[in-house]
């Protein structure tokens, strides 16, 4: 067997910023510079080796899993690749309602269905799309579904990881 030394690459180093309610912050950088890694670290999908991620006064890196799970309703992400972001076995409606069911917001199934239909319409899709599966949609339509899903819980903070790259050029602006 041949062995290789494990090498570590510092994707994000010495970064600090504040984002206040109502503000938008854009990160720009070349491919591979760590933008997606930073996004995943902010949401604690990747644990940082050092430093803090503070949201509403709490250091997310120090929170137990149960507390972080409760906070996830306020922290959402729209991933870059809509093809891998949706479960192919779930209808679009089920995918949008899943975070609502996990967090019990709204409480009734009917209210969740109505919210999912409303969100689909808000992103330019017909409410009847709820009964279809992800493979029945184009990449741009799937990305709209992912955007609708990220809005389902009315989060306080949304990270968009190149979320418009899969949308039609006419919609990107």
Where is each model-derived feature located?
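ABC transporter nucleotide-binding domains
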Residues: 1-173
């Amino acid at each position: 067997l041949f062995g290789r030394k494990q090498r570590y690459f510092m994707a994000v180093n010495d970064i600090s910023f504040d984002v206040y309610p109502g503000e938008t912050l854009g990160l720009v950088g070349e491919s591979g510079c760590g933008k997606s890694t930073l996004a995943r670290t902010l949401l604690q999908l990747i644990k940082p080796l050092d430093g803090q991620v503070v949201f509403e006064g709490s250091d997310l890196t120090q929170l137990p899993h149960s507390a972080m799970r409760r906070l996830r309703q306020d922290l959402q992400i729209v991933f870059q690749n809509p093809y891998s972001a949706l479960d192919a076995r779930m209808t679009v409606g089920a995918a949008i309602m899943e975070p609502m069911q996990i967090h019990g917001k709204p409480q009734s199934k009917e209210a969740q269905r109505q919210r999912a239909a409303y969100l689909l319409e808000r992103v330019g899709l017909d409410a009847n799309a709820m009964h279809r599966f992800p493979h029945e949609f184009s990449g741009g339509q799937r990305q709209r579904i992912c955007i609708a899903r990220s809005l389902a819980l009315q989060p306080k903070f949304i990270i968009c990881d190149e979320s418009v790259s899969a949308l039609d050029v006419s919609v990107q602006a």
